[in-house]
Amino acid sequence: MGSVVISLDAELGWGFHDLADPPTERVEAGRRGWSVMLELFEEFDIPATWAVVGHLMLDDCDGVHADHPAPDGWFDRERTDWADRDDLRYGPDLVTDLLESDTDHEFASHSFSHALFGRPETDREFAVAELERSREIAADWNESIDSFVYPRNDIGHREVLAEQGVSAYRGRSPTRDGVRGIFDSTVRDRSMLVEPAVDEYGLVNVPASMFLFGFEGPARTVAESIWTDPMVELARSGIDEATRTDGLFHMWLHPNNLTHERDDHRMRAILSHLERRRTATDLTVETMADVARRVAGPSSATERATASWS
């Protein structure tokens, strides 16, 4: 029995706060995309793993975070360019919409402030603080964290995840994005299915199969004008492959990728195809936590979570 996972990196402005020149269109699209994706998931009753930046769950802060061991200047944009942009720094309204959705989504972590765990400047102290603060805020919302999505897929400090009671993380995709990925998957007929596995820390690595917005710009416009949306075709192919096998197809995106209506159409086409295949076959839709329980069993995550709070 094959399965499909969809994970989202829910970050608003935090996904770009460390960049010298953040992409304005995507920064401004975060709230819109969040709401559109929730509506589409509810329409097709498809659960997903939403990895949320913990800072979004705050109502207010001083913009300094003096007790947080981040590198110098890490929170500067909060006090400068975005000092008057609460809509980019906070999102308790959006998180409430997520948690109150009729669809059974998984609430997961994307760190507290979009820290890049694989970078040299992210030392163990910083990584621990990012996880601890995220868990504390989640607990204030009566939520727990089973899954973690590394900001920018920059993997590091996996031992910290295990110590903090996390059971699963999204691993890197074995396939490539963009034109090269389309070539590999179509011309070379390379499988997009992935195999989750327990790593040396007892965490379940749930690798990504496909970034749903890896083929954009002029190339996308040309492709759509003479053929169709290549990413929709690839996603359908991956879903169909999972339907025929016992494999896992794992798609991911950011809400801020939905900058225009054509992006909404892409997601509607993919989700409607997934819903049809799920209805007609024994294909299942899972969250990352579901996969972790299936692969490692429910006891391992419970034991880690208990140990981390003791």
Q: Residue spans of the language-model regions?
A:
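Catalytic alpha-helical scaffold of carbohydrate-active enzymes acting on polysaccharides/glycoconjugates
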Residues: M1-V204, T228-M251, T259-S310
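Active-site clefts of carbohydrate-active enzymes
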Residues: L203-T221, H254-N256
